[in-house]
Each structure stands twice: as structure tokens, then as C-alpha cells.
Amino acid sequence: MAQESPKNSAAEIPVTSNGEVDDSREHSFNRDLKHSLPSGLGLSETQITSHGFDNTKEGVIEAGAFQGSPAPPLPSVMSPSRVAASRLAQQGSDLIVPAGGQRTQTKSGPVILADEIKNPAMEKLELVRKWSLNTYKCTRQIISEKLGRGSRTVDLELEAQIDILRDNKKKYENILKLAQTLSTQLFQMVHTQRQLGDAFADLSLKSLELHEEFGYNADTQKLLAKNGETLLGAINFFIASVNTLVNKTIEDTLMTVKQYESARIEYDAYRTDLEELNLGPRDANTLPKIEQSQHLFQAHKEKYDKMRNDVSVKLKFLEENKVKVLHNQLVLFHNAIAAYFAGNQKQLEQTLKQFHIKLKTPGVDAPSWLEEQ
């Protein structure tokens, strides 16, 4: 009997119909292994060849120096083993290829966002929430004060000064309204006197028998119209000064008073909240609320004290300015009226010069900017 050749049980080598070894699978494995390895790692070219099955070694691995340019990386390769592919993928994710061609390994970790990055929508929502809470507290405080249930902080001296200022403002507005009415009526009278003087002058030229009489009346009406224009200038100056005092200076002070009153309401509202929390139990849940309420109360107390000082200072300066302005304007008004009805033209003109009042000549337009230059 012919002796059978020993066979290796570890591997079976297929043979083609011509009796040659079928190494197509080995070439396919070598090609896949080359493609799966990362390019540019400085590895030598590896070739795996198989010898006869009757040899003592299963195969010989021949290694030589790598020659030629490295192949460009392929986008995706099917690895012969899933485990090897997963390991290569993990190694590839930690490799960074710089411009020089060398690979450096970096550590991957969780991404931490900076605290400075804020959402504008969340900021607006927070502002709306604070405004709504503050409005609710202030509204509740106002209703409680009107119903007589809540307490309010009162500065008796400052409140009295504010009440006097508001009352004086109403009276000054009434004087201003009456002075404007007088100015309108005086303007109509001056206009009528001027027309009447022109009519008398025309009749003086056409009526020879009454030439002198019409002439006297024409001169009188023209003189009255001239003096009326002078008085009208003084009254308009008085109106402008009082209007500035009432609608600008006093109004600015009253705006500060309104801010002071708003600060007072906020102060009382947060003071009431703090008092209610202090009357309740003190435990781990209420202590943070009490501390926050104490902080808000202190902030609004400082704001209230600041606004109260601002109102006191403005009221003091307003009183000094009001006395000075009204003193000059009342003297002007009295002297102009007295000189006009006394028929003292020189005294009337002297009064206007004393207060640096320039009258606009009727029928004369204002000079252009070229003439002023």
C-alpha cells in the first residue's frame, strides 16, 4: 500500500485544475490588510507566501524595505476582521496629522462650555420676570395703602414742600394763562388803533374843514399803538420767562419727585415682604428667602435715600431760582403797565432797556445770516 503523505490539519491549501496552488485568497487577504493599515507609519512592505504543505513551517514571511511613494488614504476599506477594524478605528480617531506629515496623539475628553456664553432669550425672559414681580409688589402696596391696610414711609417736611410746589405750579399756570389772554387782547387793540390812526390820517387829507381834528386823532392813535407795541413786548417777555419757570424748571423737579415716589413705593413693598418673612418660621427653606429679601430691601432702601436727597437739593435750588426770576419779572410787569397807562413813553422805553428787551419793528423782517456776518 502506498504511504499517505502527512497533511497539516491547521490549514488546507486549494489547488487549481492545472495542479498549481490557488493563492487568490492570500492575495486578497494581503491587499485588504495593506488597505486597512494606516499609510505613512514607516512600516516595511510585508509579503506573505506559502510553501509546500509537506514543509515543516506553515509559511515564510519575507520583509523588505518599503520602496515607492505611499499610497493615498482611501475613504473606506472593508477590514478582514471586525475586531481589527474597530481597533484601527479607535487608533485613527486619536491621531492628528499636522502639516509636516507627522502624526501626534491627542487625548480626547468631554467638551466644557464656558459660563460666559448666555442665551439672549433667557436674559430677556429673566428681565421680564423681575419686572413682573416688581410691578406686582408695587401694585399690591399701592392698593394696600389706598384701602388703609398697609403702612407707608412718610417724610413730613419733604411731603409738605412737595405739596406747596404742586399748588404753586397750578397758580403759576393760571397766571400764565391770564397773561397770554391779556397779550392776545392787547395785540388786537394795538392792531385796531393802528388801523384807526390810518383812517384818521386819510380823512385829514381829504377833509379840509376837519383837517386839524382828524390829524390830532391820527397822531394820538398812532402813539397809543406804538406804546401798545412796547407794552406788548414787555408782556411777552414776562410770559416767556414764567413759561420757562413753570414748564421746564418746575416740571423737571416734579419729574424727580415722581421718581422719588416710585422709589418710596418699592421700598415699602420690599419692607413689607421682609417683615412678613421675619414673622414666619425660620428653617432651612425660609432662611435663603429671608436673606434674599433682606438684600433686595437694602438695595431699595439705598435707592430711596438717594432719591430723597436729590429731591431735597432740587427743591432748595428751585426755590432760590424761582424767587430771583419772579422778582425781576414782576418788577418788569408792574413798571411797564404803570408807564403805559400813565402815558409816559420815556419811562416805558426805559423799562424795556432796563431788562434788555428788544422790540421787533413791524414790517421789518429779521436780518439774513449774511447781514449778521
UniProtKB/Swiss-Prot annotation:
Gene Ontology terms describing biological process: intracellular protein transport; negative regulation of retrograde transport, endosome to Golgi; regulation of Arp2/3 complex-mediated actin nucleation; regulation of protein secretion
Molecular function in Gene Ontology: phosphatidylinositol-4-phosphate binding; phospholipid binding; protein domain specific binding
Q: What are the entry keywords?
A: Acetylation, Golgi apparatus, Membrane, Phosphoprotein
Question: Where does it mainly reside?
Answer: Golgi
User: What domain of life does the UniProt record list for this protein's source?
Assistant: Eukaryota
Q: Where found in the cell?
A: Golgi apparatus; Golgi apparatus, trans-Golgi network membrane
Looking at the UniProt record for this protein, which Gene Ontology cellular component terms does it annotate, in alphabetical order?
Answer: cytosol; Golgi membrane; trans-Golgi network membrane
Gene3D superfamilies reported in the protein's UniProt record: Arfaptin homology (AH) domain/BAR domain (1.20.1270.60)
Give the record's PTM text: Phosphorylated by PRKD1; phosphorylation delocalizes ARFIP1 from the Golgi and disrupts its ability to inhibit the activity of ADP-ribosylation factor, an important component of the vesicle scission machinery.
Cite the record's Basic and acidic residues compositional bias ranges: 22-35
Cite a single Pfam family from the UniProt record: Arfaptin
Tissue distribution of the protein: Ubiquitously expressed. Higher levels in liver, pancreas, placenta, skeletal muscle and heart.
Per the record, residues carrying N-acetylalanine are: A2
Residues where Phosphothreonine is found: T361
Q: Which residues form the AH domain?
A: 153-353
SUPFAM superfamilies to which the protein is assigned, alphabetical: BAR/IMD domain-like
Q: Where is this region: Disordered?
A: 1-47
What's the subunit arrangement here?
A: Forms homodimers or heterodimers with ARFIP2. Interacts with non-myristoylated GTP-bound ARF3, but not to GDP-bound ARF3. Interacts with ARF1. Binds with lower affinity to ARF5 and with very little affinity to ARF6. Interacts with ARL1. Interacts with ATG9A.
- What's the stated role of this polypeptide? Plays a role in controlling biogenesis of secretory granules at the trans-Golgi network. Mechanistically, binds ARF-GTP at the neck of a growing secretory granule precursor and forms a protective scaffold. Once the granule precursor has been completely loaded, active PRKD1 phosphorylates ARFIP1 and releases it from ARFs. In turn, ARFs induce fission. Through this mechanism, ensures proper secretory granule formation at the Golgi of pancreatic beta cells.
Q: What is the name of the protein in this document?
A: Arfaptin-1
Organismal lineage: Eukaryota, Metazoa, Chordata, Craniata, Vertebrata
Gene this chain is encoded by = ARFIP1
